[in-house]
Each structure stands twice: as structure tokens, then as C-alpha cells.
Amino acid sequence: ADDDLEGFSEEDLKAIKEHRAGLAA
């Protein structure tokens, strides 16, 4: 669910997704 990502800019979303990918790795 990406509902908690509402309000973030496209750059913020990219950084968040990369951060989450790093945590999951």
C-alpha cells in the first residue's frame, strides 16, 4: 500500500523507494 506516500514529490518517492529497497536487501 503506497497510500502513506501521498503528498511526496516524485524525487521524494524515488528516494523513499530506493531506501526501502536498501532495507529489504
Curated annotation (Swiss-Prot):
What is the name listed in the Swiss-Prot or TrEMBL entry for this protein? Toxin Tpa3
Compartment annotation: Secreted
Keyword flag Metal-binding: no
Q: What is its main location?
A: secreted
Cellular component GO terms, alphabetically? extracellular region
Species this chain originates from = Tityus pachyurus
**Family indicated by similarity:** Belongs to the non-disulfide-bridged peptide (NDBP) superfamily.
Record key words, sorted = Secreted
Q: In which tissues is it expressed?
A: Expressed by the venom gland.
One further remark on this entry is: Elutes at 29.62 minutes.
Q: What role does it play? A: Unknown. Is not toxic to mammals.
